Structure formats: structure tokens, C-alpha cells
């Protein structure tokens, strides 16, 4: 009986232990389920935020891509235009005028129109210079000389107006000097003569001058030299900037990214080249202002002699070019 009671007690204790263990397991399962639900809620919220961020990033990416495609299209159009102009220039080439003393670029209608206008301008200038020379040789009075001198200066203003219009159409034609003779091109600076160099050449042609006139011409020469140096430095900076633009990026690759980069470089380079027109205009303004200020320092008769000296110097350069082109060749 004692053994039976003992077994019964053990069995009862075992059942109680199993019930307690089952209850604990139930609580643990419920807790785990609650924790899993909370984790799932947090995960869902993170996923929703991530999806929202992804959608926003995708929207911004589409906008950037649209803007980039538009930029590429604009660059492609500009590049196509450049290629067409280059092809026309190659087809038309370069020809020598019938006089044999001047090479002309035929890179477009703008260049041809300028060459024709400059030729007419030169003919009128020759006529004016002959008139001025005759007046000086005939010892004409200051009033008559002043009328002719003013006409010559107005004619120079017309030249710079013609050049300004030509620069808008083909600035490279002006910079290359193909509208000048070969000898003149040796001394070309930003599409024309250096004012400071002309003043040096005129120093011996205008004697005798008063001390005040000498000081005025020297001061004008220094001022012109400083302005020329500033423009030359600006051109050097432009050339360096252009070289940096064209050399940036990966070379030799034909991937779509590099093609797009190439087109972007060309568009940027075209924008930089647009400043060349400004350099030509500033250089011509300096030339005109130097001539005007020079005439203010000189007397009327000295002004007439100075304009003749400039004309004769240019004429000799053109004559030298003709002789050079006509020289015997072995």
C-alpha cells in the first residue's frame, strides 16, 4: 500500500510538472508571436519608407535623364552645324586673287562678303591717300588738309564697322588674316595692326615735334602697349581654357558615356570660342582710339603726314608680298 501511494504521489507531481511546462511553453509561444508581429510591423514600415525613397529617387533620376537628353540633343545639333560648316569650308577651299598678292579664305559667304567689302575699302583709301599726298605737295592750307584728314578717319571707322559685322559671321577669317597679304600677316595682331608699333614707326616721320608732343606720343605708345598686353594675356587664358576643356575626360573610348562627354565638351568649347568676337572688337576699338588720340597731339599737317606714313608702310608690305609670290623658284 505504501508503494502504491508513493507511485501515486510521483505521478501527480509529474502531471503537475507537465502542466506547468506546457503553460510556460504557451506563454513563450505567445510572447514570440507578439514579438514577431512587432518585428513584422517595423519591417513593413521600413520597407514602405524604402519604397517611397526609391520612387522619389527614380523620379529625380528621370528628370535628370530628361534634362541630360535635352542637353545632348542641343549639343548634337551644334556639333552637326559645326561639321556642316567645316565640310563647306573643305569643299570651297582657299584661292589666290588674280593680282597674285593676296590669299582669300572662302570658308563661307560671310568671309567672301567681307573680302569684297575690304577690297572696295582699300580702293577708296588709295584714292584718299593720293588726294592727301597731292594736297601736301601743293602746300594746301590747314583747312583743306583737315577736311581730307577727317575723311580718312571716317573711312577707318567704316573699316572697323565692317570688321565688327564680319566677326559675327566668321571670326576665324579675321584672326587668320587670310584677307591680308602674306607679309602683312607676319605683323598681324588680333586681326589688325599693333597701335604701339605704328607709333614707334611714326616717331622719326613726324619730326620736328615739340617736347609736349613727344611726351604725348610716348605716353600714348605706353598706354597702347599696356592695353595690347592685357588683350594678349586674355587670349592666352582663353587658349589655355579651351585646351583644358578639349583635353578633359577619357580619350580613345567609344562608349556612350564618353560620346556624351565629348558632345558636352564641344558645346562648352563653342561657348568659349564665342568670346573671340569680343577680343576682335576690343582690339579694333584700341586701334581707332589710338589713331584719334594721335591726331589730337599732332598738328593738322603732321596728322596728314602720319596718315600717309601709315598708308605707305602698308603699301610696301603688300608690294613685298607680290614680289615674294612672283620670285623665281628653282
UniProtKB/Swiss-Prot annotation:
Keywords recorded for this protein, A-Z: Activator, Coiled coil, DNA-binding, Nucleus, Transcription, Transcription regulation
Residue intervals of the bZIP domain: 44-107
Segments forming a coiled coil: 45-142, 217-233
Annotated ranges, domain DOG1: 111-327
Primary localization: nucleus
Domain of life according to the entry: Eukaryota
Pfam families: bZIP_1, DOG1
PROSITE patterns: BZIP, BZIP_BASIC, DOG1
Function: Transcriptional activator that binds specifically to the DNA sequence 5'-TGACG-3'. Recognizes ocs elements like the as-1 motif of the cauliflower mosaic virus 35S promoter. Binding to the as-1-like cis elements mediate auxin- and salicylic acid-inducible transcription. May be involved in the induction of the systemic acquired resistance (SAR) via its interaction with NPR1. Could also bind to the Hex-motif (5'-TGACGTGG-3') another cis-acting element found in plant histone promoters.
Subunit structure and binding partners: Binds DNA as a dimer. Interacts with NPR1, NPR3 and NPR4. Interacts with GRXC9/GRX480.
Name of the protein in question: Transcription factor TGA6
